[in-house]
Every structure is written in structure tokens, then in C-alpha cells.
Amino acid sequence: MLSHNALRAFDCSKVIISRRCLTSSTSIYQQSSVHLQETDDGHSGNREKHVSPFERVQNLAADLKNELKAPDSDINEVFNDFKDKIESLKQKLRNPSPMERSHLLANFSSDLLQELSYRSKNMTLDPYQVLNTLCQYKLARSQHFTIVLKYLLYNQSPQDVIALWVKYLETISENPVILLQNSSSRAHMQNIAITTIAYLSLPENTVDINILYKILQIDRKMGQVLPFNMIRRMLSTEFSSLERRDVIIKNLNTLYYQYTVQDSDHFLSQIENAPRWIDLRDLYGQYNKLEGEKNVEIISKFMDKFIDLDKPDQVVTIYNQYSKVFPNSTSLKDCLLRAVSHLRAKSSKEKLDRILAVWNSVIKPGDNIKNTSYATLVNALTDSGNFNHLKEFWEEELPKKFKKDPIVKEAFLLALCQTSPLKYDQVKGELAETVKTKKLFNKVLLLMLDDEKVSEEQFNTFYYNHYPSDGVLPPTLDTLSIKMYANYKFQAEDTRPQFDLLQSVSINPTDYEKVEKITKAFISVCPTVEPIRQLYKQLGTHLNARNYADFISAEFNKPDGTVAEAKNLFSDFLSYQKTRKRNVDNTPLNALLLGFCDKLYKSKHSEYVPYIEKYYNLAKDSSIRVSNLAVSKILFNLATFARNTQQLSDKEVAFINQFMRDLGTNEGFRPNPKDIQILKECDGITVPEKLT
């Protein structure tokens, strides 16, 4: 029997546990060996026709499912029938493995639990009793616990949730193969999220992330963390009507703040690996609104990453907010310097003036200019297109001691790599034993892969010198994506089609968040489309809309990509979306529109206009939002095409006029006046007065 002692082991004896959920939690089974054996039903002369154990289980599951789905089904009778038939089958099977591993039986059990969760208020039977029976016969899966945990939380029983979580951990320890390997990995994370919400909703509870880690048995040393995004989504959707939800949200923010303080390295890694600016914006928004003292290193990391994702305006906003909190922070000033080099400007000269203004007014007045500031100035001059000014600065103004400084030297070497077609042979002699700058390290890796004289052994020696295979120092996903491509490149031609890309860098395809991030990074580093297509095939069902958009963009951007394959990918996405039973996500369609706009701009061929029209109309007919970026690209390319074409066809004129009418009603978009003026001067084109 579980008791309060079960939780004292986790140093959280303050938690009160309901007796109802603690019953029947004794260890009830042992690990079984896995060998399918023929069943012998007796020695009578009238033997039944042989039926394999697998077929017996499948037939039983099908019968039970039909019984449950029948219009006049009595759920109590179904459950009793289930117990009787399972016991009978267990007696007939010499080896229960086919029963324990049956997906059909697991699916029926999920249906039974779900049905009972909806009906149980007026019934003597409840989901917990069913789950207990599943555990007794070693049929329980993670998703079965998920259903019951949700049921308990819906019914405002947080203590029962935590008690059931303890039973879940016991069941895992007793039978990990059956419970976890035959379950959805997402179900396990959901169980963690539900238990966390239950912990946050305990009355008179002082939130302590260390106590929660012990309850959940999360090992920070192994990089395990709480699924905060999943928790927030659950509180916004299925648990939005929970009592004391405001208290839960407040407690969650406290928990999140404790995480950013205690697990700051992991949080910094999260920022570093954010694949898109919208993800980074959400992450920053969560951190920015937290109560408590902020970490300047974290703020600086956000600023750096916003620049990498081409959002320098956001960096200026952050600087204006936090420069008052951290007035002497060199890192904030360095980020501002780098940000102004990325702000839009009419010329590189205008960018140079901004850089010098920040350098002279913000950084130079300090008593002691640091090496990081000189390195940032090198980066800023390079990124702004002022490399000639950088060479002059390096030769005439930079103090000699900083020319030998590793950080400054690496910044200059990276600038050379970015502005000149250097080969690996030209760079390797300038490298220190250890490269400190991640961007330079990644650039060197790519130069090595571009050099046919570099062997796999040389590449791996350089790579593992910086990121040992023991995983103590994990690489960024950008770096890992380069390693994944290297693993593919160094395979023999005849073995490449069978090569498992994700497995080669130890990434589980069911880790959707990590897969999404590394997919985008991998696509960006691949010089050809072939390994990208191979990754697409290997991902199979482990894709989301953003992945599809990235793969579609690759077909337009890579030298050997094709329009036909981009269209096929979009068709695959539409089929995938039907199975999700959700509104169609707009990112793949926008990727397709942007791709055709790019083709039209580069080729000047009219054959791409009908494609733009087709998919633009599809978006309208399907109520899919066309992004402002895609709208602006369509407008620009139609205007450019119309200006360069002697005579537009009737169909082209009709589409452009339709597009202009739509533009006139689009309140959320401001067109470029130059594009509007070009179209006004074209024969047959009517520009709505609102746009002029």
C-alpha cells in the first residue's frame, strides 16, 4: 500500500494524498520474457482450429471495442466482460506477451477510460478502478495514466493527481518496456505537465522547483526540464476553467522564474536554439514579465539572438528598457552596437554613421574598452558592408594588444570568411587550438566540408575536440545540423539512401520541438537538396506545418530543387492537415507563394504568374491568411513583371486587378507607393483610389 511515506522519499511530505488513489498500488507484476509460443487448449480429441496468440488478442480487442461502441452499451457490463475475457485469455496463453503488447487492446482501454471519464459522475465505477485493472494485467500505458490524471484534475483533486503520479513512477520502474516503449513519448510529457499543474494548484502551497523536481524525478544533470510551453497550452485550453486558475498562473510564473535562475544554462541554450523570431519573441515575453531580478547575461543573449533572426528593432527596444537597470553593462552596449549595424538604411555609409555614433557616445566614454567591444565593432563593420573601413580600423586604430586577443582575432577572421571566398587551407593556420566563437567554429566546419581533401577523421577530430562525445558540452542545434550533414557526406554513395540522419546525431524523431529546430538548421547548411529530401522521407509523420514550409522553401532555394517537388510537398501537407482535423496552417502556403515570387523575379518568365494566382486564390477560398511578407512580395513582383512586359495577357490583367481590389480592402497592410505607381502606369490596370 502507498502511504505518506511514498512521498516523503521525495522530500515533500507536506502534500496530502487521498486514500482512494493510494489503494491497490502494491507491486503487482514482474518482468516477463518475450517469446511467442503456441497455445495448447487441452488434450481432448476435438481440438479447436489453431488460432495464434496474436489473433486471439486482436479478436478480443475488436469484440470489446464493438461492445463499447454499441448504442445500448452498459459501461459496467463492458468492464466486467473485459475483466472476465482478459482473465480467461491469460489462462489460455502460456506467454502473456501478445496481450501485453497489443496496440488494439491498448486503444480499447483508452476508449473505455475516456468514455468513463465523461460518464462517471453518476456511476459506481470510476476511471481509477479501470486503470488499476490495466496495471494488474500489465496492460497500462502512459496514455492511460494521462486520461485518469486529467480526470482527477478536472474534478479538482490535485492531491489524487500527485498520488497517481507516484503510482505511475512505480509502474514504470516495475515494467518500463511495456509502459514506455509501447506508449507515446508525448503522453509521458503530458503526465509531467498535468502533475505540475496539480502541484501548482495545491492549497496553501509555497512553490519550490526543487521539491517539484523530486516529485517528478527530473534529473537536471541529464538536461531534463519542465515542459513549460505544454503546461501553458493546457492552462489556456483544456484546463482553462479550473478553479483558482489565477493562482495557478501566478505560481507557474514563480516556478518559471526559479527555473531561469537555477537552470540558467539550459534557459540560455533555449534562447540560442530558438528557430524563429516569433518563438524568441514569446520566450522573451515570458521572461520579461516575470517578477524578480533579471539576469543581464540572459537579456544580452536575447538581444544577440534577435539580431541573428533579423529583428534589430527589438534589440533597440530592449536596450532602452534595460540600460537603466544595468547602466554599466558592457554586453548590453555591445548588443546595441551590433543592432544598429543591422537596422535598415539607404546606404552602408548611413549604417557606418550610426555605428560610429554608438561607438563614440555609448562605448568609448567608458574608462576601459574591453575586447568584446572591439570584437563587436569588427562584426558591426562587417555586417553593415563597411569591410574597407574595418581594414583601415584594424591597421591604424586598433591597439596592438587587441590584435592578438583571441576574441578580437576570431572576429576579424570570421569577417574575412564572410567577405572573401576563403578555403580551409587558408584559414586553419590562423586558428587557435580551441575556437571560442561559435559562429567561427561553424564557419570552419562548413569550410572543411567544402574541401574534398579533408577526411572524415580530420573533421571529427576537430569537431570532438570542441564538443566531446560524452555530451558534457552539448553543441548548439546549428552546430549539430552541420555534424548531421557531415555524417551524411562522409557515407559511401551506395549507403547514403539508407543512412539515418537523425539517429546519427542521437535525436529522437518523436522529440518534435528539437526536430523542428534542427530541420530548419539542417536545410540551411545543406548545399544540395538530396539530403534534405532524404530527411523529409525519414521524418514521415513526425512533421508539423513549419517543417513542411521549410522543405517547400528548400525546393525553391537549393540549386537542384524543383517546382514539381515543391507542389508535391504542399499536396502532402494538405493530406497531413486533413488527418489533424484543424484549420490549415498558413506557413506552407506562404512558403509556396514566396517561392513562386522568387522564381518570377529571377527568371522574368510569365509561366510563374498563374502559379501565384492559383495559390493566392486557394488561400482566399480556404480562408488562409496570406502573410504581409507574402502580400508585399506578390505586389512587388507583379509590379516589376508588369513594368518589364510589353503586353500583359488578359488573364494577367484580370489577376492583377483582382489582387489590387483585395489590397484595397486589406486594412492590415501598407503597400509600397513605388509599386502602386508602377501599376497605375500600366495599361488595363485599375488601382483602387484608397491605395493612391
From Swiss-Prot:
The keyword Mitochondrion applies. Transmembrane segments: none annotated. Its main location: mitochondrion. One of its GO terms (molecular function) is mRNA binding. It is found in: Mitochondrion. May be involved in the control of meiotic sister-chromatid recombination. One of its GO terms (cellular component) is mitochondrial matrix. Residues 1-30 form a transit peptide. The keyword Transit peptide applies. This is Meiotic sister-chromatid recombination protein 6, mitochondrial. It comes from Saccharomyces cerevisiae (strain ATCC 204508 / S288c). Present with 7250 molecules/cell in log phase SD medium. GO terms for biological process: mitochondrial translational initiation; reciprocal meiotic recombination. Keywords: DNA recombination, Meiosis, Mitochondrion, Transit peptide.
